[in-house]
Amino acid sequence: MPRPITAVIHRQALQNNLAVVRKAMPNSKVFAVVKANAYGHGIERVYEAFKAADGFALLDLEEAKRIRALGWTGPILLLEGVFSPQDLFDCVQYQLSFTIHSEAQIEWVEQHPYPAQFDVFLKMNSGMSRLGFKPQHYVQAWERLNNLANVAKITHMMHFSDADGDRFGQQGIDYQITAFEEIVKDLPGERSVSNSAAILRYQDQLKSDYVRSGIMLYGSSPDYPTHSIADWGLQPTMSLRSEIISVQHLEPNESVGYGSNFVAEQPMTIGIVACGYADGYQRISPTGTPVLVDSVRTRTVGRVSMDMLAVDLTGIESAKVGSEVVLWGQSSTGVVLPIDDVAVSSGTVGYELMCAVTARVQFINQV
């Protein structure tokens, strides 16, 4: 019998979350962002749910090829563009759109030796300062591309750094969208500005012909704890489940786990769960991180080890060897433990937890 830890992927929840995007931005085309192997869910596992999107956005060519191999004939956008001149040949072969964010990438397109009709997304660095042309250099970059016979379409693109909250005491999007609009207002072309946080928080304020929905598709709130997934109508798409494999009874002053950093203050019962940091659960998750045991919310106790962790069974009379444990997601009876609750307790974000689940965990698709 295999080790009992599984990651259940809920197709219905994926479809629900895509529908939330559509409802929020009914006049926009929707890119489903599936970078990092669909945020740890697996591109092949989410494809059926997301093929109702208008396109897929991802990072590298191998992921793009996997999408094409599944039968997708619609748009695919490389969010970081090409990494070498040779990649442009694959863009032609697989009909890929790509971001342009640097002088080098423009030069590669200018020097491409064969006829092509590239669909590019020109990125402005409107304030995040990772990729893109600063506003004062953006028009020059656009003009260079617009003069090329092998560039068929240019979409204006930017990425918000603070759409999930405030920036220096102002609404998080204000600084960047002002800089962006001032430059592109007189240039032809469609726009792609909204990420998950902007889709949900500023749907009535932003014009975005293409939206790039990422974390919201996977059942994590982009502005937690201000809003939960329930507030946005989102559903958890990944449930990391395991079982209790041992029950231990602690007396006062007895400890559990490496470092003895949890010591019982009174008699208590704990369960040992088949899940550890080698499965992708965070080693730094402290005592008190929420879990579900038999659909009842409780907490972890002690240090997470490679293959196991301990949970407090106080008040859970049904708990025994074989009891279901939900590390995040939803239980088999439908009780939800939001991944954001676990992430905050662990000092991280839901994105990291999803992406960290390792290959030794069995994935199960649930319709």
Swiss-Prot record:
InterPro entries: Ala_racemase (IPR000821), Ala_racemase/Decarboxylase_C (IPR009006), Ala_racemase_C (IPR011079), Ala_racemase_N (IPR001608), Ala_racemase_pyridoxalP-BS (IPR020622), PLP-binding_barrel (IPR029066). It catalyses: L-alanine = D-alanine. It comes from the Bacteria. The keyword DNA repair does not apply. Its EC number is 5.1.1.1. GO terms for biological process: D-alanine biosynthetic process. One of its GO terms (molecular function) is pyridoxal phosphate binding. It is an enzyme of class 5 (isomerase). Pathway: Amino-acid biosynthesis; D-alanine biosynthesis; D-alanine from L-alanine: step 1/1. The modification N6-(pyridoxal phosphate)lysine is found at residue 35. The active site is at 35 (proton acceptor), 258 (proton acceptor). HAMAP family: Ala_racemase. Belongs to the alanine racemase family. This is Alanine racemase. It comes from Acinetobacter baumannii (strain SDF).
